[in-house]
């Protein structure tokens, strides 16, 4: 780690010219290993995204020696008949190199991030990466808007465009050649850039950090067209937690690129002047909302398509951008079904001896839990059937009782924690009921007993020990509100420590 810190202090003129040599440094692979170990966060289970169980310094040393001896990376050749290298699978070494590659390629962007902070009073907050930070923004802004553009983020016609764009940031030719080698080696770029990414286990487990970096760089390029929008649009809360580039360019990209776009598109900007335009991104989609007319939204739609295709060479089609009216649709994003609905209320106005009853209707953001997809996920994980009837989990009956309770408790807390912002809690209570009864049936199956006799013998209190409600947690933090727990259970609660949704979607 000290060696990396010394490297980061190098002169900026040399920062991008000697990255390839870092592949032969052992501490780079140790950093990639530590990234996988420190991935976990509160209320989330740790995913083994790297080669944690197989990592050792001896394997890394053998890998480096082999790279020194070879003129090219034969160890990554999938066409080779020999799938073992020094007693280990070649996939492991390919994986290790790609993880180390991801650590190295972030160095120039880390230097730019540090330099962007110098001489500026910018608040450094980890809350910018929270998924829940998006919803307070929606509550404040969306209720005053009319239309929304649902955009599927376009992807490059060829991954060589990504390499060409990176040449502006990285000047090490050997490093860029290695990047091309990796992209041709995996030859599955379309699955990575589209929504089929989840189906490709290679990107999910073995090379996640490497491909997420490339994906975020691609998204940054596609989003740079919004740099000419009003300055307040730049200060939206970040919705991407893994995006190293988002943090790097959150402040820096405004200064470097806005002059270029002003020069290129000043003749068209007057068509799209809209002080109420807002933008945010989630997963592989993005949303632009406005208070303007449908005609203005259509102009934005075709302007974006033409600009992506002609200026950035990104493949896009008009049918990938949908125009909807906020009052007529549900936005399905980040695990919630969100909509803007009128909220009528009656106000009594007293003026001297006269009293007036005034009906007021204000828009309110409604956030609902999607019950059908959640039950589908629970059924896929064998916690219930497709109709939502809880069943036992036979695969866990070999574990200790405490381990079984801990597993069910963790899943229940994850769901409760993430969906604490739901407007209606009944759906959330149903999910909790399924998990509780599935846990009881799993324990009863293990002890060859019925659920009723098992609960009667041990009591139902043992389930309450790990299924802690949100209001009980808050009662420890804010004792004054413990008396109004019934009212609190109906309130929406947003947390700023949730930076992943994968565990909640896949359970």
UniProtKB/Swiss-Prot annotation:
Alphabetized GO MF terms: RNA binding
Annotated localization: Plastid, Chloroplast
Principal subcellular localisation of the protein: plastid
Keyword Plastid: yes
A GO cellular-component term linked to this record: chloroplast
Domain of life the protein comes from: Eukaryota
HAMAP family: MatK
Family: Belongs to the intron maturase 2 family. MatK subfamily.
Function of the protein: Usually encoded in the trnK tRNA gene intron. Probably assists in splicing its own and other chloroplast group II introns.
Protein's name in the database: Maturase K
Originating organism: Ranunculus macranthus (Large buttercup)
């Amino acid at each position: 780690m000290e060696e990396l810190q010394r490297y980061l202090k190098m002169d900026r003129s040399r920062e991008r010219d000697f990255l390839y040599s870092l592949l032969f440094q052992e501490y780079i692979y140790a950093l990639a290993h530590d990234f996988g170990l420190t991935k976990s966060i509160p209320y989330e289970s740790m995913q083994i995204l790297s080669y944690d169980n197989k990592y050792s310094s001896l394997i890394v040393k053998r890998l480096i020696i082999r790279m020194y001896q070879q003129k090219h990376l034969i160890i990554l050749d999938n066409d080779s008949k020999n799938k073992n290298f020094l007693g280990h699978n070649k996939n492991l070494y390919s994986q290790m190199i790609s993880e180390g590659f991801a650590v190295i390629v972030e160095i120039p962007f880390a230097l730019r991030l540090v330099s962007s902070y110098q001489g500026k009073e910018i608040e450094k907050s980890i809350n910018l990466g929270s998924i829940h930070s998006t919803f307070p923004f929606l509550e404040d802004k969306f209720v005053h808007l009319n239309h929304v553009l649902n955009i599927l983020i376009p992807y490059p016609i060829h991954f060589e465009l990504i390499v060409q764009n990176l040449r502006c940031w990285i000047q090490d030719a050997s490093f860029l050649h290695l990047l091309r080698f990796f992209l041709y080696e995996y030859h599955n770029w379309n699955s990575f850039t589209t929504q089929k990414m989840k189906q490709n286990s290679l990107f999910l487990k073995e090379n996640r950090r490497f491909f997420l970096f490339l994906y975020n760089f691609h998204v940054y390029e596609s989003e740079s067209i919004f740099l000419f929008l009003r300055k307040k649009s730049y200060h939206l809360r970040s919705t991407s937690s893994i995006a190293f580039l988002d943090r790097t360019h959150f402040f820096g990209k405004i200064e470097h690129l806005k002059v270029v776009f002003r020069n290129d598109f000043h003749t068209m900007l007057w068509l799209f002047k809209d002080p109420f335009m807002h933008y945010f991104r989630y997963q592989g989609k993005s949303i632009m909302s406005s208070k303007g007319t449908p005609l203005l939204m259509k102009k934005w739609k075709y302007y974006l398509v033409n600009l992506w295709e002609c200026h950035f060479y990104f493949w896009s089609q008009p049918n990938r951008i949908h125009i909807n009216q906020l009052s007529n649709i549900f936005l399905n994003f980040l695990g919630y079904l969100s909509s803007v609905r009128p909220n009528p209320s009656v106000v009594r106005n007293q003026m001297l001896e006269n009293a007036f009853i005034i009906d007021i209707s204000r828009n309110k953001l409604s956030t609902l839990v999607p019950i059908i997809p959640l039950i589908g996920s629970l059924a896929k994980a064998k916690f219930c059937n497709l109709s939502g009837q809880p069943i036992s989990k036979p695969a866990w009956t070999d574990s200790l009782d405490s381990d079984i309770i801990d597993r069910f408790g963790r899943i229940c807390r994850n769901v409760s924690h993430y969906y604490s912002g739901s407007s209606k809690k009944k759906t959330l209570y149903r999910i909790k009921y399924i998990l509780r009864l599935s846990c009881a049936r799993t324990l009863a199956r293990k002890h060859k007993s019925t659920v009723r006799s098992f609960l009667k013998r041990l009591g139902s209190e043992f389930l309450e020990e790990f299924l802690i409600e949100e209001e009980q947690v808050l009662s420890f933090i804010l004792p004054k509100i413990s008396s109004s727990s019934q009212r609190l259970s109906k309130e929406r609660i947003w947390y700023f420590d949730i930076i992943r949704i994968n565990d909640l979607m896949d359970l």
